[in-house]
């Protein structure tokens, strides 16, 4: 037996149950016992407890006795006990209240697991498989609610739950000599339930003779009987998380490294936190992570020389790429329509909400972009969700680019589709993923011009690959329509008919300078969407005033491409100068999108850069988690047709000075 020991306090100090937990120097005592099976190392036993100095001797003795107990399948040949003093104060939480779910047999027990899992994931059987098949990891699987996506960094190791102690018993050191499955599981589950972003936990023990499991959801630990037959060595754990509340790294760090002491369950612990307390806690956690946003208020149109309530600003964060929001022809069309048709649609598209203005907008969009039909809705977000929810369901596999917009991700979640996230613009991986599809149908989902970096997707090649596998292709070109292509028709303009996506999604709130979203598609899909897409059927139609503005904007671009040419010239110049200044990688110098990503790193550095640029009179977006991965914040530059050479020169000079000079000592 090997001890890794450090100097400890007098063992005659009072036991931890009589001490104030906030004034004790707590220690982590860990035991791991190993043996050999078929000449291979074999894990025999392991345990950990946080204890006060006065309980170290008892705890070491109890854990050692457990390691050497004769009941193990394999005899321990080596026992390691380590002691580490904590350098942070533990958080104290109450144990979860407990309930019992009695099931007559494993079939009924596993159906109960599936019923609860189905609240959170589209394919509960896959999560159940982690719980019931042979163990492949020592820790737990972390699964994203809504997508089934596995999030643990190391699939062999899993996510461990460590550094928690027991304040519920008077002699914890002695009690550790014998494993008490239920009590120790409640302690572990209590820490998991307190972690940020955790929604639920499911467990089936891999102990062959312990036939109970548990479900921890809604703040209650429920023991489930007869989850497997006696002698079955299989088991596992699944932790379901909401990545909108906390990212996987934050959750894992909390579970593995944040010390927690679990006290007795109290009356208050058996009740859900009040709504006010719950919402305040979420907001405070968001603020503490440096993620709170405060919008600026404009007093002018979004021209390059804009005015906000904070004063004038040189604007580089607007998606009014062509300046059509102030185009007189667009404004005149809207003014005429409000006098003729009123300011409101008055209903959904299938009741009283469709006007001649809506038909005109759809006709102009479809003809301009080369599709038989267009379906117009209130926003790009709504159009994206409605389209994906119409096309996808649990029998559809969606191959989704890793940098797709949140609206596309949310559409997959609402559709409860089997979603496979592939590396950004990686055609080989997409091809392989389509080869592995086992569902009835498949759909490939991408942006045309990516909203965070401005690079253009290889749409033509992607369509060829997808159609070879019989898959449908949906492209969201919100940032490409009006900005790229010889006449501004977007990322698909120069493609032959055989390489065009089946559905082209777009928005009128960016280059078109108005509002609304749309889907371009064939006659069959358009008719199906108008009858069955929930976002279309059950939402009020956009105002006819908006529809008239969209029709006028499209007509303008159909006959006059000078603004498109000006924008593309500005994008090329800005990318060249930014690359020469080493602010973007050389590969980004040749991207065509009007969005330019300036890598920054930590959220705090991005915010500091944004604030310093604002002091210099420039408005630039600081894009942080969850729009990008945590720790990969960017400054997002949006070019427009109305920026001048001098505007671009000021931008590049200011960025170089701020990022290379004023913030050189900021944390990275």
Curated annotation (Swiss-Prot):
Pathway: Metabolic intermediate metabolism; pimeloyl-CoA biosynthesis; pimeloyl-CoA from pimelate: step 1/1; Cofactor biosynthesis; biotin biosynthesis. It catalyses: heptanedioate + ATP + CoA = 6-carboxyhexanoyl-CoA + AMP + diphosphate; 6-carboxyhexanoyl-[ACP] + L-alanine + H(+) = (8S)-8-amino-7-oxononanoate + holo-[ACP] + CO2. GO terms for molecular function: 6-carboxyhexanoate-CoA ligase activity; 8-amino-7-oxononanoate synthase activity; ATP binding; pyridoxal phosphate binding. It holds the Pfam family BioW. The modification N6-(pyridoxal phosphate)lysine is found at residue 510. Substrate binds at residues 293, 405. Its EC number is 6.2.1.14, 2.3.1.47. The keyword ATP-binding applies. GO terms for biological process: biotin biosynthetic process. Pyridoxal 5'-phosphate binds at residues 380-381, 451, 476-479, 507-510. The keyword Nucleotide-binding applies. InterPro entries: Aminotransferase_I/II_large (IPR004839), AON_synthase_class-II (IPR050087), BioW (IPR005499), PyrdxlP-dep_Trfase (IPR015424), PyrdxlP-dep_Trfase_major (IPR015421), PyrdxlP-dep_Trfase_small (IPR015422). Gene3D superfamilies: Aspartate Aminotransferase, domain 1 (3.90.1150.10), Type I PLP-dependent aspartate aminotransferase-like (Major domain) (3.40.640.10). Its cofactor is Mg(2+); pyridoxal 5'-phosphate. Keywords: ATP-binding, Biotin biosynthesis, Ligase, Magnesium, Multifunctional enzyme, Nucleotide-binding, Pyridoxal phosphate, Transferase. It comes from the Bacteria. Catalyzes both the decarboxylative condensation of pimeloyl-[acyl-carrier protein] and L-alanine to produce 8-amino-7-oxononanoate (AON), [acyl-carrier protein], and carbon dioxide, and the transformation of pimelate into pimeloyl-CoA with concomitant hydrolysis of ATP to AMP. In the N-terminal section; belongs to the BioW family. In the C-terminal section; belongs to the class-II pyridoxal-phosphate-dependent aminotransferase family. BioF subfamily. Homodimer. This is Biotin biosynthesis bifunctional protein BioWF. It comes from Cutibacterium acnes (strain SK137) (Propionibacterium acnes).
């Amino acid at each position: 037996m090997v001890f890794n020991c450090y100097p400890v306090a007098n063992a005659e100090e009072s036991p931890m149950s009589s001490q104030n937990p906030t004034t004790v120097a707590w220690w982590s005592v860990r035991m791991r016992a190993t043996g050999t099976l078929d000449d291979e190392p074999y894990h025999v036993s392991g345990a950990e407890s946080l204890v006060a100095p006065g309980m170290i001797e008892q705890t070491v003795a109890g854990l050692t006795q457990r390691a050497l107990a004769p009941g193990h399948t394999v005899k321990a040949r080596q026992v390691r006990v380590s002691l580490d003093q904590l350098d942070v104060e533990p958080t104290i939480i109450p144990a979860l209240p407990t309930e019992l779910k009695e099931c007559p047999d494993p079939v009924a027990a596993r159906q109960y697991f599936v019923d609860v899992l189905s609240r959170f994931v589209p394919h509960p059987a896959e999560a159940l498989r982690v719980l019931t098949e042979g163990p492949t990891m020592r820790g737990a699987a972390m699964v994203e609610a809504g997508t089934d996506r596995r999030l643990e960094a190391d699939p062999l190791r899993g996510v461990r739950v460590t550094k928690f102690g027991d304040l519920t018993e008077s002699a914890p050191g002695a009690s550790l000599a014998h494993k008490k499955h239920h009590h120790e599981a409640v302690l572990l589950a209590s820490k998991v339930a307190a972690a940020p972003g955790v929604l639920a936990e499911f467990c089936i023990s891999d102990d062959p003779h312990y036939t109970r499991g548990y479900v921890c959801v809604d703040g209650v630990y429920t023991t489930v009987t007869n989850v497997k037959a006696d002698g079955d060595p299989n088991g596992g754990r699944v932790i379901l998380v909401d990545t909108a509340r906390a990212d996987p790294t934050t959750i894992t760090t909390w579970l593995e490294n944040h010390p927690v002491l679990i006290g007795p369950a109290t009356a208050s612990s058996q009740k859900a936190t009040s709504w006010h307390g719950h919402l305040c806690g979420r907001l405070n956690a968001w603020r503490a992570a440096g993620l709170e946003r405060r919008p600026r208020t404009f007093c002018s149109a979004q021209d390059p020389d804009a005015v906000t309530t904070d004063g004038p600003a040189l604007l580089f964060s607007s998606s009014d790429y062509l300046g059509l929001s102030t185009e007189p022809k667009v404004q005149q069309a809207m003014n005429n329509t409000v006098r003729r048709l009123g300011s409101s649609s008055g209903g959904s598209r299938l009741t009283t909400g469709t006007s001649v203005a809506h038909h005109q907008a759809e006709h102009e969009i479809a003809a301009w972009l080369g599709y038989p039909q267009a379906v117009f809705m209130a926003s790009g977000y709504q159009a994206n969700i409605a389209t994906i929810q119409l096309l996808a369901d649990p029998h559809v596999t969606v191959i989704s680019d890793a940098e797709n917009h949140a609206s596309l991700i949310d559409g997959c979640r609402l559709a409860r589709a089997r979603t496979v996230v592939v590396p950004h613009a990686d055609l080989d991986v997409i091809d392989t993923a389509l080869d592995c599809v086992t569902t009835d149908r498949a759909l490939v989902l991408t942006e045309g011009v990516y909203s965070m970096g401005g690079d253009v997707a290889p749409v033509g090649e992607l369509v060829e690959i997808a159609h070879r596998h019989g898959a449908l292709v949906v492209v969201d070109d919100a940032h490409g329509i009006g900005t790229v292509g010889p006449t501004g028709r977007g990322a698909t303009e120069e493609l032959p008919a055989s390489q065009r996506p089946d559905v082209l999604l777009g928005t009128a709130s960016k280059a078109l300078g108005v509002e609304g979203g749309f889907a371009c598609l064939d006659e069959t899909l358009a008719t199906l969407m108008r009858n069955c897409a929930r976002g279309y059927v059950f939402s009020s139609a956009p105002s006819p005033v908006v529809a008239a503005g969209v029709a006028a904007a499209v007509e303008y671009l159909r006959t006059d491409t000078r603004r498109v040419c000006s924008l593309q010239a500005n994008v090329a110049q800005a990318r060249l100068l930014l690359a020469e200044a080493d602010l973007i990688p050389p590969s980004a110098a040749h991207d065509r999108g009007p969005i330019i990503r300036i890598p920054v790193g930590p959220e705090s550095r991005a915010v500091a850069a944004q604030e310093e640029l604002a002091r210099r009179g420039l408005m630039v977006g600081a894009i942080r988690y969850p729009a990008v991965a945590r720790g990969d914040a960017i400054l997002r530059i949006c070019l427009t047709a109305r920026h001048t050479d001098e505007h671009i020169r000021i931008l590049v000079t200011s960025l170089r000075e701020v990022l290379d000079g004023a913030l050189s000592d900021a944390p990275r």
